[in-house]
Curated annotation (Swiss-Prot):
It catalyses: a (3R)-hydroxyacyl-[ACP] = a (2E)-enoyl-[ACP] + H2O. It is found in: Cytoplasm. It is an enzyme of class 4 (lyase). This is 3-hydroxyacyl-[acyl-carrier-protein] dehydratase FabZ. Belongs to the thioester dehydratase family. FabZ subfamily.
Length: 150
C-alpha cells in the first residue's frame, strides 16, 4: 500500500465538486499527495444513462466523458491541495492537449484515474492524466483547469 493511500468517499468528493448525478464521474479517491498527484476510480455499470444511446447494441463509454472524469479528478487534486473549496469558487476545465484513446471502456470496467500536477500558474493548473482499465491505458491527455470566483 502506498504511503499516500487515502480513502475519500463520494460524500467528500461532493463537497469538493459541484457535479451531481448523472455528471459526477469519480466514485472514490484512493491515493493523493497534495500538489503532486491523485489516484481515483469510477465503477462503470450498464446503468449509466449514456449507455442508452451510446450504443444500445454495443455499449461503450463516450471518450469525452472519460476526459471529463479525468478533469474532475484533477479538480479534486487542486481543491484538496489548497485545503477545501471556498463557497464562491469553482474549478473549470479549460483546456486539453495530446488526448489519445487507446482502449474502449464498457460496462463492468473499473476506470482508474492517475493525475499528476505539472504546473500551476495564476490559478491555472496543468495536469498529466491517464485513465486505465485492468492496468491498460484507455485514455491519456494533458488537462488544464482554472480556479475562478463565481
Amino acid at each position: 500500500m502506498s504511503e499516500h493511500a487515502v480513502s475519500i468517499d463520494v460524500r467528500e468528493i461532493m463537497r469538493c465538486l459541484p457535479h451531481r448525478y448523472p455528471f459526477l464521474l469519480v466514485d472514490r479517491v484512493t491515493e493523493m499527495e497534495p500538489n503532486v498527484r491523485i489516484k481515483a476510480l469510477k465503477n462503470v455499470t450498464i446503468n449509466e444513462p449514456f449507455f442508452v444511446g451510446h450504443f444500445e447494441q454495443y455499449p461503450v463509454m463516450p471518450g469525452v466523458l472519460i476526459i471529463e472524469a479525468l478533469a474532475q479528478a484533477a479538480g479534486i487534486l487542486a481543491i484538496k491541495s489548497q485545503g477545501e473549496r471556498l463557497e464562491n469558487e469553482l474549478y473549470f476545465f479549460v483546456g486539453i492537449d495530446n488526448a489519445r484513446f487507446k482502449r474502449q471502456v464498457v460496462p463492468g470496467d473499473q476506470l482508474v484515474f492517475e493525475v499528476t500536477q505539472m504546473t500551476v500558474k495564476r490559478g491555472i493548473g496543468k495536469y498529466a492524466a491517464r485513465a486505465l482499465v485492468d492496468g491498460q491505458v484507455a485514455c491519456e491527455a494533458e488537462i488544464m483547469c482554472a480556479r475562478r470566483e463565481v
